[in-house]
Regions:
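Extended, charge-rich low-complexity interaction segments
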Residues: 37-52, 148-158, 236-266, 382-393
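Conserved helicase motor core of SF1/SF2 NTP-dependent helicases
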Residues: 55, 62-155, 164-167, 187-205, ...
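Short basic/glycine-enriched coil/helix segment immediately N-terminal to the Walker B
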Residues: 30-56, 77-80, 319
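Conserved two-lobed SF2 helicase motor
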Residues: 9-15, 31-37, 305-313
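Conserved active-site motif detector
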Residues: 364-473
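Conserved helicase/translocase motor-coupling segment
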Residues: 171-301, 306
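P-loop NTPase Walker
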Residues: 1-26
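Conserved C-terminal motor-coupling region of P-loop helicases
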Residues: 262-386
């Protein structure tokens, strides 16, 4: 759109609300910032120019929360001629745990007498995947969308449904991956973090390279050591527009300081994404907001020979040639879980394998009797009882560590990098400095309880690595 792009603001609800309130965004203040911004607009405490808009476009409108919808209402109330365009798919509302609810997209339609355009063409998935997704979507209650999606792409594909007895049948997924030798991108999608970690460990034991998609739910990317250094160096050398030489110096400093860090690739991917979004003129404030609004999972890129392992939630917005969907323990499901499963199915382009237990598909007439009449669809029963895995992978966060233990250890910790090995002795973590063992961490009481239960099953901690190096303030 040329120069008109200079007049377009692209913001998250949270960053826009921080701006309305004249505050710098932070994780601690983000929970109630939208609610506070709505109150400020209603009380005329916000400059009129900040809320005067001619067009408002809402992406992923199915994920609006009550506060976010209230903000949209206020913007409409304050702009008589404003055009509102909302884009969303209520079948893909999978963030209810954050307060999102697709009924607010429905209220947007009913309250403002909106015209609805159904975009039903699917340019991603093959016909067998589309057929299963349509059949499964019909089991979701209170839908806005009533017409089935249509396959646009050609080519062959297949859907495989495998029913298991309850248990640890993640091994069946690993066995299928090893036997299939499928070309193209592949992903194992799970409903829980524990299952993603379990499958990742299983693949590793079988010599398969796996890329586990990680999240930064408990911290901001500002505080990731690699990005913290990059931003701090830029901030020390400029205050508004970032000159090319300052940018280059920060890149050189970061890549040199963290050459051995396993998180450097993710950090550089994040920086590269900012470069693409701002190819010519870059502002310090935009960089700060970009780091604050970004999700770590957006920058976890898999190599051609790697299997992506992720929860369905972290896979939203991605696509893969081959998807292995692990639905372990999903026996009694609600519409919330059905929408998550639907999103997982529709990540697949060509091949989809669904491993499940229970009666997830009993409500689909063409699948209820255990047969599959649709072309490219097979339904199988695997009666094998799989043993618990020999090896588990655990990811620790702030909640799993005794934070006070880090006090006074900044000199030792600053010498570590993501990926560095640590020794586990009892409930403590140690690194080796100049031939001497130095304590750098201690497990929290909650994690010690979890670890004790695993030890009662025969598991023993054998190794540990630094996941992320973070600034705590």
């Amino acid at each position: 759109i040329g120069n008109a792009a200079e007049y377009v603001e692209i913001r998250t609800f949270h960053s826009y609300c921080f701006d309305l309130l004249g505050k710098v965004g932070s994780i601690d203040d983000s929970e109630n910032v939208v609610d506070k911004a709505v109150d400020a607009v209603m009380d005329s405490q916000v400059e009129r120019s900040r809320i005067t808009k001619s067009i408002l476009v809402i992406d992923e409108a199915q994920d609006m929360s009550e506060d976010e919808f209230a903000l949209v209402r206020e913007l409409v109330r304050n702009n008589d001629d404003m055009r509102v365009i909302a884009v969303g798919d209520d079948d893909q509302n999978i963030y209810e745990f954050r307060g999102s609810d697709s009924r607010y997209m429905g209220l947007l339609i009913s309250e403002f007498n909106a015209k609805v355009y159904n975009m039903l063409e699917n340019f991603r998935s093959c016909q067998p995947v589309i057929a299963l997704a349509n059949s499964f979507a019909r089991t979701i209650g209170n839908r806005l969308k009533s017409e089935p999606i249509r396959c646009v792409v050609g080519g062959d594909g297949c859907v495989r449904l495998v029913r298991h007895p309850a248990g640890y049948y993640g091994q069946a997924v690993v066995d299928e991956i090893l036997a299939a030798h499928r070309s193209g991108s592949s992903a194992v999608l799970t409903m829980t973090n524990d299952d993603a970690l379990m499958v990742s460990a299983m693949l590793g034991r079988r010599g398969v390279k796996a890329r586990l998609i990680q999240s930064n739910d408990s911290f901001s990317l500002h505080d990731l050591a690699e990005l913290h250094l990059f931003y701090s160096d830029i901030r020390a050398n400029c205050s508004t527009i970032i000159p090319d030489n300052v940018w280059a110096h920060a890149m050189e400093l970061t890549t040199g300081e963290f050459a051995g860090s396993s998180s450097l690739e993710i950090a550089l991917s994040c920086i590269g994404a900012f470069e693409k979004e701002y190819p010519s003129k870059r502002y310090v404030s935009d960089l700060f907001n970009f780091f604050g609004e970004s999700e770590l999972s957006d920058f976890c890129k898999a190599a051609r020979n790697e299997i992506v392992v992720s929860t369905v939630h972290k896979s939203k917005g991605r696509e893969f040639d081959n998807v292995y969907l692990l639905l372990r323990g999903m026996t009694q499901i609600t519409d919330r879980e059905r929408r998550v499963i639907y999103v997982g199915m529709t990540r697949a382009k060509t091949n989809l394998s669904v491993h499940f237990d229970g009666g997830i598909f009993h409500s689909i007439p063409e699948l209820a009797d255990g047969g599959g009449s649709a072309a490219g669809l097979s339904i199988e029963n695997d009666p094998k009882l799989y043993a618990e895995p020999d090896e588990l992978l655990l990811q620790l966060s702030h909640r799993d560590l005794h934070l006070d233990c880090f006090k006074g250890k900044s000199d030792i910790i600053s010498k570590l990098c993501s990926g560095d090995a640590l020794n586990v002795i009892d409930d403590r973590l140690y690194t080796t400095v100049n031939g001497y063992s130095q304590q750098v961490g201690r497990f929290s009481e909650a994690f010690r309880t979890k670890l004790s239960k695993l030890q009662q099953k025969g598991y023993v901690p054998i190794s540990s690595r630094v996941r992320f190096l973070l600034f705590w303030h």
